[in-house]
Amino acid sequence: GTTGSATGATEEFNTTTSTITGAAWASGGNLNTARGILAGAGTQTAALGFGGYTLPGNSASNATEEYNGTSWSNQNNLGTSRRNLAGAGTQTAGLGFGGHAYRANTEEYDGSSWTAGGDLNTARKSPGGAGTQTAGLGFGGYTPSPPTTGATEEYNGSSWTSSNSMN
């Protein structure tokens, strides 16, 4: 993940360290496009970073980059520029959904390009994301009214289904 606001810095967590200390994190390669509030998917050696905002002006970004454990490489852009979106899945089967301005759209990444997926039932910004491209989970976030939501949805690779809300 990134630290600070729209930095290009990457830090990697060392899972062999049993406690969180300064030695648990190591610097990795910088993003090619410095951004904040971007989404991610994948693992430490096969990650995907996409969307977010760039400075100055907090402009929404459609940039997509892949990380190989050492460096980031630019890839084909998201179809929709946005920040405050969620990510799930892997570097070769990623999922991006939601976003600022209370978006419902979902995009699927196949390792080289993004295509449109099924829309969320509840449009939201800053949702949580987990799972895979064919068994994804979207939860929480901000909606116009009320300001926060506990709504949870499950993605099957083509459409979202409402599930039990968060408590």
Task: Describe each PLM feature range.
Residues 1-167:
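Polar, enzyme-active/binding microenvironments
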